[in-house]
């Protein structure tokens, strides 16, 4: 990601981060520019700095050939720059009580980096999904899965690789990525996940 700082009289007055990623959505290649960490020093507000930051981001994305620009934030702030709501965010908490009558059925979690073959299988699985983002080779793929202080896990079925997930730190921990080719494993996975995280449960988003 590229961080850009706006200076006023030699002092930092604003900042934004731009990350450009290549996606494949149902066979269509799309370059997406993601904007984040947009902020202006409280002492410098009301001077048009936010508009300058957004204009700079727009120019950089156009120069990079981005097809889509996305960000998260207050609608009333960013609609002025042409951004509109474009999705829904679902979140819930899974606790051991929710799955107390479901057996793990031989499903378990193990650190993904434990065996190179698991990591290779996870990357191959990711690349087969209908919506993917270019993540590079195995080492880069693992680094991405570790974002937000996450621990990547292999999902095992009777000791064999069956999928992968990434569990981020938190109270409760957060399941931030899950790929299971066989949807029939979801109940057993939920039970194994609840068992792994303990009484705190897990936040799913």
Where are these regions (language model features)?
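Conserved beta-strand in the GNAT
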Residues: 5, 11-21, 32-39, 154, ...
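Amide-forming acyltransferase catalytic core, primarily the GNAT-like/NAT-type
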Residues: 85-197, 201-205
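Conserved acetyl-CoA-binding loop-helix of GNAT-fold acetyltransferases
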Residues: 35-40, 46-59, 182-194
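Conserved active-site alpha-helix within GNAT-family acetyltransferase domains
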Residues: 63-67, 73-91
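Short loop/turn motifs at secondary-structure junctions
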Residues: 31-34, 65-67, 174, 197-200
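Short loop/turn motifs at secondary-structure junctions and domain boundaries
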Residues: 1, 27-29, 143-149
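Short coil/turn motifs at secondary-structure junctions
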Residues: 21-23, 43, 76
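Conserved hydrophobic beta-strand within the GNAT/NAT acetyltransferase core sheet
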Residues: 69-72, 202-204
């Amino acid at each position: 990601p590229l961080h850009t700082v706006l200076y006023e009289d030699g002092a930092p007055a604003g900042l934004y981060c731009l990350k450009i990623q290549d996606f494949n959505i149902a066979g269509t290649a799309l370059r997406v520019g993601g904007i984040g960490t947009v902020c202006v020093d409280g002492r410098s507000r009301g001077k048009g700095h936010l508009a300058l930051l957004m204009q700079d981001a727009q120019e950089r994305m156009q120069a990079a050939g981005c097809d889509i620009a996305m960000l998260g934030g207050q609608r009333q702030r960013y609609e002025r720059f042409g951004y509109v709501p474009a999705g829904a965010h679902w979140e819930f908490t899974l606790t051991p009580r929710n799955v107390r009558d479901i057996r793990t059925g031989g499903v378990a979690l193990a650190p993904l980096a434990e065996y190179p073959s698991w990591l290779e299988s996870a990357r191959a699985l990711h690349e087969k999904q209908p919506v993917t983002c270019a993540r590079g080779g195995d080492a880069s793929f693992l680094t991405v899965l570790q974002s937000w202080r996450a621990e990547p896990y292999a999902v095992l079925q009777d000791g064999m690789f069956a999928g992968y997930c990434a569990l981020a730190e938190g109270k409760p921990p957060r399941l931030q990525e899950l790929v299971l080719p066989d949807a029939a494993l979801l109940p057993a996975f939920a039970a194994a996940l609840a068992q792994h995280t303990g009484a705190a449960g897990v936040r799913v988003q």
